[in-house]
């Protein structure tokens, strides 16, 4: 029965890809509209594909170098699993492929969404949302397909005769974890590079176009407007997709490894197998129910932003309610130990995700008081807008942090049978909560990818000179997109926190494998006891490595981890500043030298701005990304396992809170500007509007570059630590 249930995993992944193809074909049948709309969409598509081509060249070089390094470690020094180089490549390939397919769909969907909005609001919403669903379903489909492929392959090729049955599953799951580093590395380049690109273009377009020249957003007279629209795709579609692909795979793989570890001492291999496949089955059922939720999203004509939010919320909530019922059914069919309470841990994960999403919506949507007050602060100039936005961002961290803390404790206690000493099952519960939060990713990512599609549709309508009624509809879709994008960032950050914690626990399992590979059969405890490495518990490893707050290596690692979050943000913020500076200079040059741009008599050189953003993003993304990869390796070689654990704890705790602050402050600044543009506090062109545009410009790298990139930093450092565990155990200095 259990083996039969497992086949639901590859079947669900293939079904997700089939529906993604169906939604893509349906979208492509729609008309792109007028010749001008087609021309604009083609320019955006060309710029986006040109950027991805350049990015993948650089990422390919980095991957080649890392594969050579992993091959030397695996086949030369034997401190790493022999499957790591290949697993690393497949993780990166599928992550990149999901971003490419999602972005290609988004660039074809924007003009079709704008054209559909000429007929009705519901038509525009349907095309934009179902095109976003292509991204969501491709991510979960490819992710789960990769996981099921590797499980079946490793189960067939890893010999059972050299291992006890329970140890074989531990080796399989820890080996599978390593392809997560490929996904993480690709995701970091996609997020950082895409974030730098989109914000360099956005800041350049806003500062010179809106503030200096006084022309509206997406005005065809602005030379940076095509680059700005390209940026929405490379940052918020390809970047977000790679980010959540990594979280999705990471949470499932980490939980499977923790499930194998929880039953490593048991003679019951059947129960261990059930614990390993449970997170995969929950994810598989989540795919099926996400598809149902996607089909349920529709709205009425003349809907307000709240009505549109309600439409998307209905689809997401429907999927969430159904996944709760389905989880209880699946785990009952599995007859997993303590299945009722483990099912409740899935509910905890979903609730944490909902709380974080609603909290983000409250603090960033112009429908609520915090953002409205932020708009009002513009009466006294841009300085108070920036001060108020920073304060709002800091206050907004409270609810998500408390929600995650409650989620960690609740899921730990539920899975462990309310026994804090049952660490193995407790950590498995935290992993299950992370899987629960991401189980409806098919539809939640659809709402995220919808945002940039709607934004591009609005830009297309503005540049093509469509009527006021069409602009009103695309503005409504765009305004909703800003909120769903902000909510999506909060969701991504929350999932990164739980996934990061599950990966942190999985690191100990990788240390066990590393010690075994080096021939360390027994562990000598500080109290004189000797424990078999193969049978050591999490607590035994903590005692063996003296992982306590009074250990200077742990403290040093924690400080370094906290520093990494700020160092990384500083590097990415400065990168945006430098790239935006080049863009500002170019836009000013074109206004100055190309006569007739502002009167509409001459067309700007859009391609030059696209090339500047592309070049700037490629140049600036390498250093932050390499530092994120090298930090865990250097810490491990100097301070050993203890220092790495401190680094991961410090990076997780500080990075999580800092990411929420930056994402919410940036989202609030963006929507404060939108609230003024709706006609409040003097409307467009007034002094309050100019002040909120400055706030929005400051917030751009907060919410679209540094904040979201921290999610990946948290997970990538854990993944690098896991992959390099053998190196740390073998060659650490202290």
Swiss-Prot record:
<feature type="transmembrane region" description="Helical">
    <location>
        <begin position="3"/>
        <end position="23"/>
    </location>
</feature>
<keyword id="KW-0997">Cell inner membrane</keyword>
<feature type="binding site">
    <location>
        <position position="696"/>
    </location>
    <ligand>
        <name>Ca(2+)</name>
    </ligand>
</feature>
<keyword id="KW-0630">Potassium</keyword>
<protein>
    <recommendedName>
        <fullName>Putative K(+)-stimulated pyrophosphate-energized sodium pump</fullName>
        <ecNumber>7.2.3.1</ecNumber>
    </recommendedName>
</protein>
<feature type="transmembrane region" description="Helical">
    <location>
        <begin position="169"/>
        <end position="189"/>
    </location>
</feature>
<feature type="site" description="Important for ion transport">
    <location>
        <position position="704"/>
    </location>
</feature>
<feature type="transmembrane region" description="Helical">
    <location>
        <begin position="377"/>
        <end position="397"/>
    </location>
</feature>
<feature type="transmembrane region" description="Helical">
    <location>
        <begin position="314"/>
        <end position="334"/>
    </location>
</feature>
<dbReference type="GO" id="GO:0000287">
    <property type="term" value="F:magnesium ion binding"/>
</dbReference>
<comment type="subunit">
    <text>Homodimer.</text>
</comment>
<dbReference type="GO" id="GO:0030955">
    <property type="term" value="F:potassium ion binding"/>
</dbReference>
<feature type="binding site">
    <location>
        <position position="700"/>
    </location>
    <ligand>
        <name>Ca(2+)</name>
    </ligand>
</feature>
<dbReference type="GO" id="GO:0004427">
    <property type="term" value="F:inorganic diphosphate phosphatase activity"/>
</dbReference>
<feature type="transmembrane region" description="Helical">
    <location>
        <begin position="134"/>
        <end position="154"/>
    </location>
</feature>
<dbReference type="GO" id="GO:0005886">
    <property type="term" value="C:plasma membrane"/>
</dbReference>
<feature type="transmembrane region" description="Helical">
    <location>
        <begin position="275"/>
        <end position="295"/>
    </location>
</feature>
<feature type="binding site">
    <location>
        <position position="703"/>
    </location>
    <ligand>
        <name>substrate</name>
    </ligand>
</feature>
<feature type="site" description="Important for ion transport">
    <location>
        <position position="236"/>
    </location>
</feature>
<keyword id="KW-0106">Calcium</keyword>
<feature type="transmembrane region" description="Helical">
    <location>
        <begin position="650"/>
        <end position="670"/>
    </location>
</feature>
<feature type="binding site">
    <location>
        <position position="232"/>
    </location>
    <ligand>
        <name>Mg(2+) 2</name>
    </ligand>
</feature>
<feature type="binding site">
    <location>
        <position position="670"/>
    </location>
    <ligand>
        <name>Ca(2+)</name>
    </ligand>
</feature>
<keyword id="KW-0406">Ion transport</keyword>
<feature type="site" description="Determinant of potassium dependence">
    <location>
        <position position="485"/>
    </location>
</feature>
<feature type="transmembrane region" description="Helical">
    <location>
        <begin position="82"/>
        <end position="102"/>
    </location>
</feature>
<feature type="binding site">
    <location>
        <position position="206"/>
    </location>
    <ligand>
        <name>Mg(2+) 1</name>
    </ligand>
</feature>
<feature type="binding site">
    <location>
        <position position="202"/>
    </location>
    <ligand>
        <name>Mg(2+) 1</name>
    </ligand>
</feature>
<keyword id="KW-1003">Cell membrane</keyword>
<keyword id="KW-0813">Transport</keyword>
<dbReference type="GO" id="GO:0009678">
    <property type="term" value="F:diphosphate hydrolysis-driven proton transmembrane transporter activity"/>
</dbReference>
<feature type="binding site">
    <location>
        <position position="229"/>
    </location>
    <ligand>
        <name>Mg(2+) 2</name>
    </ligand>
</feature>
<comment type="similarity">
    <text>Belongs to the H(+)-translocating pyrophosphatase (TC 3.A.10) family. K(+)-stimulated subfamily.</text>
</comment>
<feature type="site" description="Important for ion transport">
    <location>
        <position position="243"/>
    </location>
</feature>
<feature type="transmembrane region" description="Helical">
    <location>
        <begin position="712"/>
        <end position="732"/>
    </location>
</feature>
<dbReference type="GO" id="GO:0006814">
    <property type="term" value="P:sodium ion transport"/>
</dbReference>
<keyword id="KW-1278">Translocase</keyword>
<feature type="transmembrane region" description="Helical">
    <location>
        <begin position="244"/>
        <end position="264"/>
    </location>
</feature>
<dbReference type="Pfam" id="PF03030">
    <property type="entry name" value="H_PPase"/>
</dbReference>
<keyword id="KW-0460">Magnesium</keyword>
<keyword id="KW-1133">Transmembrane helix</keyword>
<comment type="function">
    <text>Sodium pump that utilizes the energy of pyrophosphate hydrolysis as the driving force for Na(+) movement across the membrane.</text>
</comment>
């Amino acid at each position: 029965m259990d083996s039969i249930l497992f086949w639901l995993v590859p079947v669900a992944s293939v079904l997700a890809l089939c529906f993604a193809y169906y939604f893509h074909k349906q979208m492509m049948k729609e008309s792109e509209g007028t010749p001008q709309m087609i021309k604009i969409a083609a320019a955006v598509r060309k710029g986006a594909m040109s950027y991805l081509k350049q990015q993948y060249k650089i990422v390919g070089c980095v991957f080649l170098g890392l594969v050579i390094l992993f091959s030397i470690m695996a086949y030369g020094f034997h401190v790493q699993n022999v499957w790591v180089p290949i697993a690393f490549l497949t993780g990166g390939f599928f992550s990149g492929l999901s971003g490419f397919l999602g972005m290609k769909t988004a660039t074809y969907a924007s003009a079709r969404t704008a054209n559909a909005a000429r007929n009705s609001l519901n038509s525009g919403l349907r095309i934009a949302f179902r095109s976003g669903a292509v991204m969501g379903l491709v991510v979960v489909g490819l992710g789960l397909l990769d996981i099921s492929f590797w499980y079946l392959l490793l189960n067939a090729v890893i010999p059972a005769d050299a291992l006890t049955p329970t140890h074989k599953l531990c080796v399989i799951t820890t080996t599978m974890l390593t392809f997560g580093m490929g996904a993480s590395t690709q995701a970091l380049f996609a997020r950082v590079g895409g974030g730098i690109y989109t914000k360099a273009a956005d800041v350049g377009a806003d500062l010179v176009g809106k503030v200096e020249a006084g022309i509206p957003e997406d005005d065809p007279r602005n030379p940076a407007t095509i680059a700005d629209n390209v940026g929405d795709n490379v940052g918020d579609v390809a970047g977000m997709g790679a980010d959540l692909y990594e979280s999705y795979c990471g949470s499932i793989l980490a939980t499977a490894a923790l499930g194998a570890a929880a039953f490593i001492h048991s003679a019951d291999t059947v129960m261990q197998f059930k614990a390993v496949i449970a997170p995969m089955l929950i994810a598989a059922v989540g795919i099926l129910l996400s598809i149902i939720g996607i089909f349920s999203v529709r709205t009425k004509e003349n809907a307000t932003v709240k009505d549109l939010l309600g439409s998307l919320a209905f689809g997401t909530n429907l999927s969430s309610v159904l996944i709760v019922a389905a989880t209880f059914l699946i785990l009952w069919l599995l007859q997993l130990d303590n299945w009722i309470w483990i099912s409740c841990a899935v509910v905890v994960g979903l609730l944490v995700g909902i709380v974080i999403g609603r909290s983000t919506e409250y603090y960033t949507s112009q429908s609520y008081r915090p953002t409205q007050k932020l708009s009002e602060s513009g009466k006294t100039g841009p300085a108070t807008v920036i001060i108020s936005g920073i304060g709002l961002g800091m206050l907004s961290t409270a609810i998500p942090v408390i929600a995650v803390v409650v989620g960690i404790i609740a899921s730990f206690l539920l899975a462990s049978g309310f026994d804090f000493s049952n660490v193995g099952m407790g950590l498995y519960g935290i992993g299950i909560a992370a899987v629960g939060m991401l189980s409806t990713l098919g539809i939640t990512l659809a709402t995220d990818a919808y945002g940039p599609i709607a934004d591009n549709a609005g830009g297309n309508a503005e540049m093509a000179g469509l009527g006021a009624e069409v602009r009103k509809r695309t503005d409504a879709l765009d305004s909703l997109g800003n909120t769903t994008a902000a909510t999506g960032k909060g969701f991504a950050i929350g999932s990164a926190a739980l996934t990061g914690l599950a990966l942190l626990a999985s690191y100990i399992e990788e240390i066990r494998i590393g010690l075994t590979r080096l021939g360390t059969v027994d562990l000598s405890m500080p109290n004189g006891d000797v424990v078999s490495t193969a049978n050591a518990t999490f607590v035994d490893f903590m005692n063996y490595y003296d992982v306590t707050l009074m250990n200077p290596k742990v403290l040093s690692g924690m400080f370094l981890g906290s520093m990494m979050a700020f160092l990384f943000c500083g590097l990415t913020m400065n990168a945006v500043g430098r790239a935006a500076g080049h863009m500002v200079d170019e836009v000013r040059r074109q206004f100055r030298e190309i006569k007739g741009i502002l009167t509409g008599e001459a067309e700007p050189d859009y391609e030059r701005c696209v090339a500047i953003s592309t070049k700037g993003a490629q140049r600036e993304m390498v250093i932050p990304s390499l530092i994120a990869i090298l930090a865990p390796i250097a810490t491990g070689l100097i301070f050993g396992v203890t220092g790495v654990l401190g680094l991961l704890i410090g990076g997780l705790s500080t990075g999580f809170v800092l990411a929420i602050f930056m994402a919410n402050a940036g989202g609030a600044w963006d929507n404060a500007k939108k609230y003024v543009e709706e006609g409040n506090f003097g409307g467009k062109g007034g002094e309050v509007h100019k002040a909120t545009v400055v706030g929005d410009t400051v917030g751009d790298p907060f919410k679209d570059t540094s904040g979201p990139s921290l999610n990946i930093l948290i997970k990538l450092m854990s993944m690098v630590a896991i992959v390099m565990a053998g190196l740390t155990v073998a060659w650490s200095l202290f």
